[in-house]
Structures are given as C-alpha cells and as structure tokens.
C-alpha cells in the first residue's frame, strides 16, 4: 500500500460496501471482530445488512473484558438479537486473558475473568467460559495471542476473513498495521487486506479510510443502533478523540477511568477492589494530567535523563524493575551493536515513532508501559517469561549493561 493518499472514484460508504460485498462473495467463512465501539459497530451494521441482502451468514467475535460499562454489554446484546437471522455463531468470549495494567507497578499485568477472585460482574450464561472450548487456548494468554490464534482456528484450514474495524487515521500504529509495505495482500488491488499468521485467514479492514466525522455522520443519517455510552461521554465533556470503548487499564484507555466513577459508581467500587491502582488512576490518569508522563514529562533539575531512568528503576518493586532492566538492556545493546550511543534527548523522541533516547526510556517507565511498546517490544509469551527473564539477566552481565542495578 502506498504511504500517499490516492483519492478513489467513489465515496467511503460505497467503497466500504464494495469491500464487504467482495469479502462475503470471495471468502467462505467471515467473522466480524466486534468490541461494542462505534467503529466495529458500524462495520457490523454494514456487514450484517449486506449479508442479509445476499443470503449469507457471518460470525461475530466479542471479547468480554469483565470490567466494562453496562451500556456496552447491553448494546452488544442488542446487536446480537438484531442480526440473529444472519449470525451463524456469536463467540462471546469470557476467558482469562492477560493485558497491561498501566496503573500499578505492583500489578503491572491483570487478567480478566481470573480464576478464584471476585469478578467485577458475572458473564452472560451463554458466554464461552470453558477453557477447553478453543483447542489453542492457554491460560493467561494475551489478547494479541488469542486473536492471532483465533483467526487460524476459525478458518478451519480454509480461506476465511477476520473483519476488523480499525481506521488508519486513529493512530500511527494503526496506520502502519494497514499500510506497511511488508504486509502480504490478498491481491495488489486489495490494499485493505493483510495475511493473518497461519496462512488461511485474511484480515479485512473495510473502513480503514474513514475519519471519525464520517463515522458519526453515518450514524446520524442512518439512525442505526449505537452504544449509548457515547452520549454519556459527550455529556460529561469527553473530547471525541478520547472516547474509547475497550479494556480500561491500558496506557491510553486509563484516561477514561474517571467515567466509571461518574456513570456506574457500583461498578467503580468493584473495579477498585479488583485491580491494583484503579483508584489513583481515576484521580491522576486524566488526559490533562502529567502524572503518568502521558504527554509532557519532567525530571529533577540536578539529574540527566539517564540518571533519572536509573532512579526510577531503583524506586520500583524489584520484580517490576528487573523486567524493565531486561527490556532496556536489549534496547541499548541493539543500538550498541550498530555503533549508536543512545543520547539523553533528541528531537521527536517522545512521539509515536521510536526515536531512541534516555528521555524516551523515562517516558516508558513513567507511563507504566510494562510491555515496552514504545521501545518497539511486543508482549513475551507467559509460558516462556521466566526462562526469558533469566536468560536476559545473564546477557546483561555479558554486555555490561544495567548489571548490579547500576
């Protein structure tokens, strides 16, 4: 896909319908990934309506994060009932999945539906709660792992589509996920498709070129069901760019934590008891607050950024600090091998693009970015984590980087 925008001879709604129609006609199995948000909701509306006209069946995947608004759960159930005639299988997944908890250094990861703890709410009776339902499922696997494995499992070794409602203008990472020149396409004239791991499924992005104004214009014109939580967010003064519906404790998502306190006080109380750091996150994680180093980061005047990073590491719980030391050591060694010394700061070093500096490392630590995504890391598989940790700890001694906690 070109990094330059090339105008199409049709509008975005016509283009989206054309892409969905092609998907339904070309691939025998189609699954819509649905979060309960405005984008995936619009995609589900379009896909289900076209499937109904064409006499086709679709499947839907919904990951239930346990700590979610009642509005969202009710909305998901409403769409499930609205399109029951075209939905062959609705995978309402309520299994333990691991994701970041960017609110606490004592519990930097959390599992939804974790066994033997008191949950924020109970899953629906027909939700998938049996770990043996999916042959690929491993207890505590990450959301990213689950979705990759699900795509291959769903294909049944035949061509299949996983429809994903992300938009390229939402973030740099989402733009790259679609536009990267390294992605394999179904065909050269299908730049809105990418190959899923496993070789049988294809990720389809039918609304990749929509803007947020286009989304709301469509809902206004068509009067289709939308998550009522957005109305509550609007009334609470939340800017459009911060209206997110997903798991609530990630680096970006935590900015909306305070809404639980306002909209659902009972659920808020359960979340505070369930997940470490939620109460402080509700106070300090707002989009205008610098507590977590979200936008602007400051350091003590008598320290440089490298010294500040070491101070932050030494102030953390030891287990969490060792995790970060291992990641940072790999990061520094990678540049060391290229003959590049990571500077204290450089222009653009705390933006979306990974421009190396000690200030960027400080931002990762302040942001509680446990998986170090801002340093271009992906989550380590939980079953390999302990062995990986010990191996990198030994490598640090060999490299002479961040050994002896200095």
Swiss-Prot record:
Gene3D superfamilies: HUPs. One of its GO terms (molecular function) is catalytic activity. One of its GO terms (biological process) is cellular response to oxygen levels. It comes from the Bacteria. Pfam families: DUF3440, PAPS_reduct. This is Uncharacterized protein YbdN. It comes from Escherichia coli (strain K12).
């Amino acid at each position: 896909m070109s990094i330059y925008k090339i105008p199409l001879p049709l509008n975005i709604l016509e283009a989206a319908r054309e892409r969905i129609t092609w998907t339904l006609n070309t691939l025998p199995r189609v699954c819509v990934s649905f979060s309960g948000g405005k984008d995936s909701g619009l995609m589900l509306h379009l896909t289900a309506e076209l499937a109904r006209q064409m006499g086709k069946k679709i499947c839907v995947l919904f990951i239930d994060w346990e700590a979610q608004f009642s509005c969202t759960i009710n909305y998901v159930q409403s769409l499930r009932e609205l399109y029951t005639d075209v939905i062959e299988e609705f995978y309402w997944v309520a299994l333990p999945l691991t994701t970041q908890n960017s609110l606490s250094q004592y519990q930097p990861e959390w599992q939804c539906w974790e066994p033997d703890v008191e949950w924020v709410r109970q899953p629906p009776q027909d939700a998938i709660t049996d770990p043996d339902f999916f042959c690929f499922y491993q207890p505590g696997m990450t959301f990213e792992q689950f979705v990759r494995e699900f795509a291959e499992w769903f294909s049944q070794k035949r061509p299949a589509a996983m429809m994903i409602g992300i938009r390229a203008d939402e973030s740099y990472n989402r733009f790259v996920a679609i536009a990267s020149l390294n992605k394999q396409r179904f065909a050269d004239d299908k730049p809105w498709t990418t190959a899923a791991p496993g070789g049988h499924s294809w990720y389809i992005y039918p609304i990749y070129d929509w803007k947020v104004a286009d989304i709301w214009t469509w809902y206004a014109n068509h009067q289709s069901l939308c998550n009522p939580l957005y109305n509550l967010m609007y009334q609470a003064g939340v800017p459009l760019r911060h209206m997110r519906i997903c798991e609530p404790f990630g680096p970006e998502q935590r900015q909306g934590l305070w809404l639980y306190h306002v909209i659902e006080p009972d659920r808020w109380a359960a979340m505070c008891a369930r997940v470490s750091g939620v109460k402080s996150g509700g106070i300090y994680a707002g989009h205008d607050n610098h507590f977590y180093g979200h936008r602007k980061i400051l350091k003590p005047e008598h320290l440089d950024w490298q010294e500040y990073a070491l101070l932050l590491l030494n102030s953390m719980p030891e287990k969490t600090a060792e995790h970060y030391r291992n990641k940072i050591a790999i990061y520094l060694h990678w540049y060391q091998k290229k003959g590049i010394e990571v500077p204290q700061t450089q222009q653009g070093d705390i933006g979306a693009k990974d421009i190396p500096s000690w200030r960027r490392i400080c931002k990762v630590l302040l942001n509680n970015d446990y998986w170090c995504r801002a340093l271009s890391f992906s989550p380590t598989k939980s079953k390999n984590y302990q062995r990986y940790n010990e191996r990198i700890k030994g490598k640090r001694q060999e490299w002479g980087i961040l050994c002896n906690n200095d």
